């Protein structure tokens, strides 16, 4: 079966079919957790990419999409993000308190998010403002709820995957009353 093939191929999966039936499960290898890196120096290797901050207009922010604790890739298992203290909701936009003030918003307001890349309007409606200790001029939203804001032409050079960590957005009050 496929698990037999996996255990022949991937280190740490030895006796997978037996171990998977153990009460409480088992840990798969994780080089970061174990402090073991398969490099010449047996250390992690970091690189710094050239990055130029985009010039933002007065009302623009840089949005990044993130995953919640209860999520694996696009599979959402629940509405809680215990990492960030956000519960029972995913349509949130996390903002720095100074940006909230600058945009004349308050924690809990309902807003719409816009992207105008290439002259095309993209909108994600009805997001709840959450004050969060994020750098100024930045916003964080959950993936895939704001994928609509990522231009289809905005992709990484080599992998051609959507570039969803630097999306320029505008935030407008929705005037929706909860």
Give the location of each predicted region.
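Long, low-complexity segments enriched in small/aliphatic residues
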Residues: 1-81
């Amino acid at each position: 079966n496929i698990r037999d093939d996996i255990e022949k191929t991937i280190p740490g999966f030895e006796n997978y079919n037996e171990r998977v039936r153990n009460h409480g499960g088992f840990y798969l290898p994780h080089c970061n957790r174990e402090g073991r890196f398969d490099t010449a120096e047996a250390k992690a290797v970091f690189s710094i990419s050239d990055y130029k901050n985009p010039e933002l207009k007065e009302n623009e922010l840089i949005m990044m999409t993130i995953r919640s604790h209860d999520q694996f890739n696009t599979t959402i298992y629940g509405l809680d993000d215990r990492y960030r203290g956000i519960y029972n909701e995913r349509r949130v936009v996390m903002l720095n308190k100074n940006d909230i003030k600058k945009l004349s918003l308050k924690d809990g307001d309902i807003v719409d998010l816009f992207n105008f890349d290439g002259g095309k309007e993209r909108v994600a409606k009805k997001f709840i403002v959450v004050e969060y200790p994020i750098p100024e001029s930045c916003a964080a939203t959950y993936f895939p709820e704001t994928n609509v804001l990522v231009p289809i032409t905005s992709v990484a050079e080599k992998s051609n995957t959507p570039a969803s960590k630097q999306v320029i957005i505008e935030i407008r009050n929705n005037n929706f009353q909860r």
